[in-house]
Amino acid sequence: MITLAVDCMGGDHGPRVTLAACRAFLDHHPDARLLLVGQTDSLRSFTHARAALVAATEVVAMDDSVEVALRKKKDSSMRVAIQQVKDGAASAAVSAGNTGALMAIARYLLKTLDGIDRPAIATQLPNARGGATTVLDLGANVDCSAEHLLQFAVMGSALVSALQEGGEPTVGLLNIGQEAIKGSEIIKRAGELLRSAAQCGDLNFHGNVEGDDIFKGSVDIVVCDGFVGNVALKASEGLAAMIIGALKIEFSRHVFAKMAAIVAYPVLQALMKRMDYRRYNGAALLGLRGLVFKSHGSADAMAFEQALNRAYDAARNNLLDRVRARIAHAAPLLAPADAQPKPDIAATTHR
């Protein structure tokens, strides 16, 4: 039985969405159990043989600062959910709440794995091959060293290996060109480290990739710093929304366009399904001594259920042990990233 701790109060919609998603998830996973964390009055109506309520008196708001969430709201549903993972009561925690707060609390309670300086946020973006490309970091670390990028690649490889069937996942380093001589000094150094890791058998490094390769599906994993990754994520979400919105407008302009829309409906439906972010919801916070997954803050029930699915698959396939094993194997290359003091938590806008 795999147990997940769910922050039922987080996100833009709170229990109205999270509880509906939890019920659907339990219906689809007979070997799963949920710990529903939140304010008792809001969760009391939910009953299920494989669900238990865990009381939390406070809620981390989407606009709460990291300091407020970490130091003043010590009985928040987000914190109590992550505490279940620390205590061994749950295999993973899932929240749609404030990303900066989630990362700060998770890092404070769970700590980072040996050999990892900073956790990273990893999620999937749809690609032209009908699958998805895993991208990290998506906002946890705005400034990264070459060693950080190597650590992200190692953790990303473990994630994809755990969640997808197939051979060793391919890794690409996001750059302004495919040539090794291009990019900043940090990117060039990261490329050298990734090539060394590939020679040692720690990674399947493809080489440098460009932004369009994320959506071509040229590689399974794209590694970048959190600033670039977050910009790429938000740009792709905005582009997808613009395309879908433009199609709706154009097909409703006049009667002939509406007739064309009826004929093209199956194709349009398939296109919209492939571009629907809800199918890829659920970002992993990698590098911690416990599994934590972040749902999009505006997720509906379908999207939040997908985040639960991701956490369930990660726990079932022993993601944490896989990350530890890869880190141990790559330990000679994972030297201390830099001599700079670690920031408490980088500001992030990933929701």
UniProtKB/Swiss-Prot annotation:
Reactions the enzyme catalyzes: a fatty acyl-[ACP] + phosphate = an acyl phosphate + holo-[ACP]
Gene Ontology biological-process entries: fatty acid biosynthetic process; phospholipid biosynthetic process
GO cellular component: cytoplasm
EC number: 2.3.1.274
InterPro entries cross-referenced by the UniProt entry: FA_synthesis (IPR003664), Phospholipid_synth_PlsX-like (IPR012281)
Entry keyword Transferase: yes
Enzyme class: transferase
A Pfam family the protein falls into: FA_synthesis
Family: Belongs to the PlsX family.
Full protein name: Phosphate acyltransferase
Organism name: Verminephrobacter eiseniae (strain EF01-2)
